[in-house]
Structure formats: structure tokens, C-alpha cells
Amino acid sequence: EKCGVPEWTIKALARDFAEKTTSILHYMGGSMFRGPYSHEPARLECILLAMQGLGGPGVHQAQISYTGMPRAKGLGSTRFFNPSLSQRLTKPVQTTIRAWGKQLIPKTMIHDAILNPPLEFWGNGGIEERVEDQFVKYEYPLPKDKGGTDIRMMWTDTPCRITCWNYGNETIVAERNPQIEFILAQHPWLENDCLYADMILPANTLLEVDDIVTNTRQGIQHHTINLQTKAIEPVGESKSDYEVVLEIAKKLGKGEEFSEGKSIRDLQQEVFHNMELENFISWDDFEKNQYVVLPTAEDWEDDVVGLRPFYEDPENNPIPTPSGKLEFYSERIDKHYPDDLERPPIPKWVEKSAMHDERLSSFRSNAYPLLLMSNHGRWRMQSQCDDITWCREIVTCKVKAWDGYLYEPCWIHPQDAESRDIKDGDIVQVFNER
């Protein structure tokens, strides 16, 4: 009735799940977690695993990439952390949105902050933020006596807000708003937000910079550190993102404070030493080979497996919930948002709400019966690699029309396509009342 899958198929899946030792694996969640009410299947997974005995042999919720790799020598854990680099690396990565400023705006609300202030919102939206932050109420702008101000300038080194995030059209309107006196972009290409910038500083591509990088997220099975050496000299007057910021810092009299007097090579060596890589390779050999593969620790099999301690002794190994136990009924949500229809204390099917009414049961489905799933592009990561001509030659990457334009592919179920007389290679318009 709701999803078009026969009842007996759903029951068969449930029985199959229950009868077998089951783990649930993700990378970043995919389209399952990129839509309305996506938190409900995520929470339901936890309940299903609880019914299996979470933490027991073969019953885990895990990421299939780097956090599941065997521990390497020298790192101490699967997540690199060095106290001496905390302020420069860990803090900005984990909580960029509130790292230094008094005032913050989630990236998904920038257009609203410009066009429809003042704003109130719960949680700052920072990556890997504390669970409790979702119950903190923020406002924009802050009162002036607390350092609040409206937005007058925008500086972007990733000018793809229009394509890669929500409300692209509203973002265009916001960037053209007279309140915004100046937009600075640094980028190798004239992409998206660059079209609305007052000044564009040419940035290097990856092939034009010297760096030191880790390689743990690309499907490999070992922790690898690479010394990145530029393949070509910078094109024209382009500079690396670091050099762009450094030049601006110099103009503001902050150059020495920003660079600490260190060259790019100095910074490479600093990372090398802070990661204690000299235990595995000398700097000279690292500079010559340009990589080192960290060996897997001999005792990696002794590491704690998932939530095994909680499974074996939940009283002495509580998990980070108010009760320390698995909660089918969320005490946090019950305390802060007991009447939330979109995210109730216990996960369940949510048919519709004031914010989202996208089901076949909605009145809108009479005029717009198809549901659009906006997955990542098959041959790129968001907009990255979209400009590679080789990729565009792939049949499922772009659809070339009579006008010579390469259109984005639209995948339609054969039955829906046939009923609309749509054939492979046709150009279609996807629209609704918005």
C-alpha cells in the first residue's frame, strides 16, 4: 500500500533478517539517509540490531571503509589524533562551524540568513558535533553587544554552494542581494558561485601543489601516507589555497602569525614528525619514495570489537545514552521534543508533515505522481569530475541531445517511461509546481 512492495516480500525479508546473524554496514549512508525523515530508518536499524543482540558476534553497525580497517602501528587508533595539532587540525575539522567565530550559520541556511533574518534554529549542523548540540537553540544574528552582525562579505574557497547543496536558486538570489557588498572566490575554474563573485583568485589544481596526505578512505586496506609532489608548475599566476590565504594575511599584517615562518617543506616535515613516521622510514627515504605504508599492528586482533564490552557487561560498559542502555524510546527526544511529529521518541513510519508531503497519498501526487530521488551522480562526486570530457563520453554519464548539449541522465522505471512514451535517449523535463 505504501511502497509498492508486496506484503509477503516484506515479511520474508523480516524473517530472513531475524533468523540470521546480521550486521548492517554503511559507507556514508547514500540516498537512504538523504531525504525527508531519513532519521527514522537510521534509528530503526538500531532497534533491529538491538533485537539481534548488538555487540554480539556478527551483530554490529559499522562503516565499511577506513574506520573498520585493522589498527596500524604508530597511530594508536583508527582515528589520527595528536594533541599538539589539536587546534590546527582536530578542532577545525570536527566543529568548523563554531571553531572560532562568535556567530554561526549552518551552511544549509546561508540563503535564509541573508534573505530572511532573523533566524532561530536547533543545533549548529557541525560535522561530528556532540549529540547534545541538537537540543541547543541558536539565533542569527546575535545581539550587537554579543558580537552579532549581518553578512556583508562572502569568501569561498569551495564555490559550489549552488550545485552541491540545497536551495540553489535561492542561493543565487542571496548572492546577488544588495546587502552583500563583496564576494571573493578562489578556484581553478569559473564554476557556480564564481559567476557571482566580485573577485576571483586563481587557485591551483591538485596537480600543481606540494603537500603531504593520508590515503585511508579510497577503498585500500592499509594506512598510507603520501608525499605529494606537484606534477606541473602552477598555471599562470595561480597559487595553492594555502598561498592565497597567506598572501591575504600578509596584506592584513598577519602573514608571519599565519605561517609561523614555515615553508611548505617545513610544514610537510612537521606533519611527518608529528605522526612519528620516522619510526618507519627516514625523511630522506620518504622524500625519495614519496610514500610509506604503515604496517598493521601485530596485536590488532586483540582490539575491542565494536560494542562487545556492552554486550558482555552492559552495567559496567554503558553506551552514551541517558540510561546507558539501548533505548527503543528516546529519553532525549521525549524530554526536549515530545510532540515532534517528524521525529517522535520511538521511530516509526511518518506519512507526512507540514514540511514534507511527498507520498502517493498526498493531494500533490494527483498532479505529480513520480517521486524524484536525487542520488549522487554515477560518474562523479557531487560536481567534482563533471568537467572531465572522458567521463562525458560514457553513455550513462550524459545524454547528448539534438542541440549538442550534454544533459544530465534521468533514470525512469520502464513502466513509467512506457506510459509516457519516453524512450532511451529522449530529453525530458522534470518539474513540479515549485
Region spans (language model):
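Flexible glycine/proline-enriched surface loops and loop-helix/loop-strand junctions
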Residues: 1, 26-32, 224-233
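Intrinsically disordered or highly flexible coil/loop and linker segments, enriched in small
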Residues: 5, 19-26, 54-61, 160-163, ...
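Alpha-amylase-like alpha-glycosidases and glucanotransferases acting on alpha-linked glucans and related
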Residues: 229-238, 242-246
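Short, hydrophobic/amphipathic alpha-helical patches that form generic packing surfaces
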Residues: 44-51, 246-251, 375
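A glycine-rich phosphate-binding loop feature that marks nucleotide/adenosyl-phosphate handling sites
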Residues: 16, 61-72, 261-276, 376
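Non-catalytic, well-ordered alpha-helical segments in soluble enzyme domains
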Residues: 241-258
